[in-house]
């Protein structure tokens, strides 16, 4: 039995989607393979991509809650009620997807008034 590649390709072109699906399943079963795309695995010890977007998270208000609320209002543009709720419900993200410089600046402002802040 000679294999004619052109005939096989012509048959595949004429097949319906359901028939092709059945063909793939049969090949998977017959040869013990899978048609799933291979997953790229990052090399261990390789240089990790540098993070470009950061999130500033208020961990806790510390002792001077009123000062922290004022700074949160300044940073986020929220109203008094919303800023107070955010501070009361810490830990909460204040700003997301920002540059490292801006994140460090916000962290410094909040820590200056006694808040505990994390940059992620």
Curated annotation (Swiss-Prot):
Give the InterPro entries listed for this entry: Ribosomal_bL12 (IPR000206), Ribosomal_bL12_C (IPR013823), Ribosomal_bL12_C/ClpS-like (IPR014719), Ribosomal_bL12_oligo (IPR008932), Ribosomal_bL12_oligo_N_sf (IPR036235)
Annotated Gene Ontology cellular component terms: cytosolic large ribosomal subunit
Q: Does the keyword Ribosomal protein apply?
A: yes
UniProt superkingdom: Bacteria
Question: Entry's CDD domains?
Answer: Ribosomal_L7_L12
A Pfam family it matches: Ribosomal_L12_N
Q: What Gene Ontology molecular function terms does this protein carry? A: mRNA binding; structural constituent of ribosome
What GO terms describe the biological role, i.e. biological process, of this protein? translation
Keywords attached to this Swiss-Prot or TrEMBL record, sorted alphabetically, are:
Ribonucleoprotein, Ribosomal protein
Query: SUPFAM superfamilies attached here?
Result: ClpS-like, Ribosomal protein L7/12, oligomerisation (N-terminal) domain
The answer to keyword Ribosomal protein applying to this record is: yes
HAMAP family, per database record: Ribosomal_bL12 (MF_00368)
Subunit record text: Homodimer. Part of the ribosomal stalk of the 50S ribosomal subunit. Forms a multimeric L10(L12)X complex, where L10 forms an elongated spine to which 2 to 4 L12 dimers bind in a sequential fashion. Binds GTP-bound translation factors.
| Family that this chain belongs to | Belongs to the bacterial ribosomal protein bL12 family.
> Could you tell me what this protein does?
Forms part of the ribosomal stalk which helps the ribosome interact with GTP-bound translation factors. Is thus essential for accurate translation.
Task: Quote the protein name from its UniProt record.
Answer: Large ribosomal subunit protein bL12
Q: Which organism is it from?
A: Listeria monocytogenes serovar 1/2a (strain ATCC BAA-679 / EGD-e)
């Amino acid at each position: 039995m000679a294999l004619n590649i052109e005939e096989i390709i012509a048959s595949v072109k004429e097949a319906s989607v359901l028939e092709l699906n059945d063909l793939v399943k049969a090949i998977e079963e017959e040869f013990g393979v899978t048609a799933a795309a291979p997953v790229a695995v990052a090399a261990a010890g390789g240089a990790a991509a540098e993070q470009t977007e950061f999130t500033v998270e208020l961990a806790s208000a510390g002792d001077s809650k009123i000062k922290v609320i004022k700074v949160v209002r300044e940073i986020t543009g929220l109203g008094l009620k919303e800023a107070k709720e955010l501070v009361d419900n810490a830990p909460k993200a204040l700003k997301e997807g920002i540059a490292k410089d801006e994140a460090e600046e916000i962290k410094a402002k909040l820590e200056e008034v006694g808040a505990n802040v994390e940059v992620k």
